[in-house]
Amino acid sequence: MALPFARCWKLYRWGTKRWGVPAVESRRGISFKLEEKTAHSSLALFRGDTGVKYGLVGLEPTKVALNLERFREWAVVLGDTTVTSGRHYWEVTVKRSQQFRIGVADVDMSRDSCVGADDRSWVFSYAQRKWHSMLANEKAPIKGIGQPEKVGLLLDYEAKKLSLVDVSRISVIHTLQTDFRGPVAPAFALWDGELLTHSGLEVPKGL
C-alpha cells in the first residue's frame, strides 16, 4: 500500500512553537523527553516520558486526544526537542523490543506516514533479528551488531550524518547520509515491547 505524504507548514509552525528553543551544540548535547502529543494511540509513555511501550489499540491507549500533531496510522512518537546544528549523542535501551525503528525526523513530517517510509526521516530498524538503515522505504542491511541491550545514536547536523553506535566499544557501526532541510527531532517507532531513551549525554571521545 502506498504511503501518503503531505507537507504541512501549519504543523511545522505549531511544532516549533511547542518544542520551544531548539537544542544547541554544547558539551552535553541534546536533552529530550518524548512528546506525548505526537504519540500514536497504541503507545504509552513511562518513566517521566523518557520511555515508550507498545500496546494493542484500545487496550492501553494514550490519554492525549486526537490532534494534528499526533501520528494517526503508525506507532510513532517524536522527541520534544529539535536540533538545527551541532553534534549530539543519545542512547536507547532496546533489549525489551523485537521490532522497532530509531532515528530522527523532520518535525513536520506527515502524521500519516511512518519514520523510515518517507524521505523526511532517517532511521535504523530492527525486526526479525536483523538491522537495517532506512530512508524512503528503502532498506540497507547492517552487519556485525547482533542484539545489544543498548545502542547509541550520533547526529552530526552540519555533516548531515546519523550514525548507529556500539555503546560497548564506543565505535560507529553504520552511518546514514541524510538531507536535513530544517529542524529535526529524535524519532521512534515500535510494534513490540518497550524502548527507553537516555539523553543529555556527552559525545563520547573518539566519535
UniProtKB/Swiss-Prot annotation:
Modified residues annotated as N6-succinyllysine in this record: K139
SMART domains in the record: SPRY (SM00449)
UniProt xrefs under InterPro entries: B30.2/SPRY (IPR001870), B30.2/SPRY_sf (IPR043136), Butyrophylin_SPRY (IPR003879), ConA-like_dom_sf (IPR013320), E3_ligase_FN3/SPRY (IPR050617), SPRY_dom (IPR003877)
Domain of life the protein comes from: Eukaryota
N6-acetyllysine found at: K53, K130
Keywords of the record: Acetylation
Coiled-coil ranges per UniProt: none
One annotated Gene Ontology cellular component of this protein: mitochondrion
B30.2/SPRY domain mapped to chain residues: 12-207
Name of the molecule in the record: SPRY domain-containing protein 4
Organism: Mus musculus (Mouse)
